[in-house]
């Protein structure tokens, strides 16, 4: 049925936005209603040269069911979307390869910006 639905209505694609952290711009930030956390790949954390990374004992289960132990948590990072600045915490994960995205913005972030995701329009 999924293929038929996509043919009838069209695939709305993946909800991505552009944002900035410090002087770095990211064009592939995934708005993920299925994620209860915000995720930042370790390579991006290292590019930011942010000094503080809090240790954590949590484990993260990814969409492919693999379980990872994060490098840590970076707290109170200002994320800029257009002219708005939003404080966010990110779980920093060592990710394998290029995922095709820069950040994962989960429900906590989407809630704080009062995001509305409309997959019915393009």
Regions found by a protein language model. Name each.
Residues 1-122:
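Proline- and glycine-rich low-complexity segments
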């Amino acid at each position: 049925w999924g293929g038929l639905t996509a043919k009838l209505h069209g695939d709305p694609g993946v909800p991505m936005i552009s944002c900035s952290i410090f002087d770095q711009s990211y064009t592939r930030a995934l708005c993920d209603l299925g994620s209860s956390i915000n995720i930042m790949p370790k390579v991006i954390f290292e590019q930011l040269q942010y000094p503080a990374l809090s240790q954590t004992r949590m484990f993260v289960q990814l969409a492919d069911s693999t379980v990872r132990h994060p490098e840590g948590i970076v707290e109170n990072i200002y994320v800029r979307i257009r002219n708005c600045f939003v404080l966010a915490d990110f779980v920093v994960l060592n990710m394998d390869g290029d995922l095709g995205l820069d950040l994962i913005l989960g429900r906590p972030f989407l809630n704080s910006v009062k995001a509305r995701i409309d997959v019915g329009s393009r």
